[in-house]
Amino acid sequence: MNKQKFYTNLSKEVSYALRHAQWKYELELDENGWVSVEQLLHALHQSIEWRDVKIEDLKIMIEKSEKKRHELKENKIRALYGHSIPMKIVKEEGVPPEFLYHGTSPRFLNSIESNGLSPMSRQYVHLSEDIITAELVGKRKDKHPIILEVNTGKAREEGVKFYLGNEKVWLADEIPSEFIAINKN
């Protein structure tokens, strides 16, 4: 692929991630639409096509773009327009559905069974309201993800707090392993 085509395709991928599918890429945008470059690169690196993308590539992508679609400031990036879903993820405590789902690679299962779900490089653990969404997120990490089911009722009884993310995503600080099961569906 020639360089111009590479940067055009990268711009489309970054736009999709920042404007329309933060939930799929597990990105946490602030109230002004900014996300850390580190978090975006981590999400992009889940795909073989974007595994080698570096901050320098994002800078070149922005410079070469005819239309200014993205802005890079310090170690944060944002899309300048065209968002189809709300940008702000407000940490507002809420009562989630009885079960939430998390898609991940089978290689992480032993650690999750021992230690539960933790946010890793993010601020929160991301959980989906439905299995399909969890599977889409999980497929960014593994072609054949496992879907974990979180019993939110029992977790809330033990003090786990859940926060509203957006229409598809709930957030939590962490989920202890006793509230997690493998979804068999």
Curated annotation (Swiss-Prot):
GO terms for molecular function: NAD+ poly-ADP-ribosyltransferase activity; tRNA 2'-phosphotransferase activity. It is an enzyme of class 2 (transferase). One of its GO terms (biological process) is tRNA splicing, via endonucleolytic cleavage and ligation. Pfam families: PTS_2-RNA. Its EC number is 2.7.1.-. Keywords: NAD, Transferase. The keyword Transit peptide does not apply. It comes from the Bacteria. InterPro entries: Ptrans_KptA/Tpt1, RNA_2'-PTrans_C, RNA_2'-PTrans_KptA, RNA_2'-PTrans_N. SUPFAM superfamilies: ADP-ribosylation. Belongs to the KptA/TPT1 family. Removes the 2'-phosphate from RNA via an intermediate in which the phosphate is ADP-ribosylated by NAD followed by a presumed transesterification to release the RNA and generate ADP-ribose 1''-2''-cyclic phosphate (APPR>P). May function as an ADP-ribosylase. PANTHER family: PUTATIVE PHOSPHOTRANSFERASE, TRNA 2'-PHOSPHOTRANSFERASE 1. This is Probable RNA 2'-phosphotransferase.
